[in-house]
């Protein structure tokens, strides 16, 4: 699937010095995904099931910014023409295989294990720049291409977890995941423990708690405060380390008369080795290597979520509200001071309603409200 977005402007002016002046600005964006997968499931016995799958994904994004200035008419002695054009192309392609197994040795244990292997092909940035001005000599005209090396990476992971029903009231899930990422003669490894538990206080009331650690070797970098598909997938390198996050959560749940489910959950997430563009780099492509545009820092995300859900009767649905905070801290951004993340949406409200008219016909409606994304607007411009 491919999508295209084009925006632009054109200004005209007349003065005593020139018969015509025209300024034209065009911005062009194109992006798309291609996905293919195949899988095979097999029952080894009534206690062991396995699945093998292979997949291919490709993502590409292209941005072009073009500005033209024309003064006078071509052929006249006072004719002036200038052009500034920059084009950026970025993308990632993945090939992979994944195995997963589900083993139930006894009623109290459900063991899941498996692994996956991926080959990543990165094109971090391909920049083409052009600057023409008919008032300057040919030696000062610019038409250059800057391309970062295309990168190949290998990612390997293996995991195992046990869902253990210790009693009718208490359930424990314990898991461990090992990951390995190799790129440009550098290998990173990570251990990711995960544990969650559920305690049934009564038939209608339960508590849940969890902790998890995650290592991420491919960073999603946003270079715009707008919700545009201009984000880039960037790998870890010798300079840039993997993202490491730790998250804890605690929740309470109540079922009222088998009719309504009420829940409240709180969470706290800590992230290290986050990447953001340094101050001064934006949506418009530049000739600076992508690694040198990056700043590394830390972040936090925490909040509380409330939900009411109805799952019986002809009319069902749910209402959810989240009160959340998210911030970032980078030594090279905002003078090292902590600031709200782009995704620091303080309030979020979701309402979903479904109604069955008959066995074959169902109507549904959804409404979402969310606080806007944070951004910083410049106070001064220099030309």
Model-found features: residue ranges?
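Transmembrane beta-strands of outer-membrane beta-barrel pores
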Residues: 2-3, 56-60, 117-123, 176-182, ...
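Surface-exposed extracellular loop regions of Gram-negative outer-membrane beta-barrel proteins
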Residues: 11-14, 60, 128-129, 203-248, ...
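Face-selective signature of the C-terminal outer-membrane beta-barrel domain
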Residues: 30-184, 263, 311, 318
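Hydrophobic, lipid-facing positions within transmembrane beta-strands of outer-membrane proteins
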Residues: 32-38, 54, 93-99, 154-160, ...
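Residue-level signature of outer-membrane beta-barrel architecture
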Residues: 41-42, 93, 99-105, 163-164, ...
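Outer-membrane beta-barrel channels and translocator barrels
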Residues: 45-47, 104-108, 167-171, 200-204, ...
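Outer membrane beta-barrel strand-and-loop segments of large Gram-negative receptors
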Residues: 90, 94-100, 147-151, 157, ...
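Gram-negative outer-membrane beta-barrel transporters
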Residues: 167, 268-270, 288-380
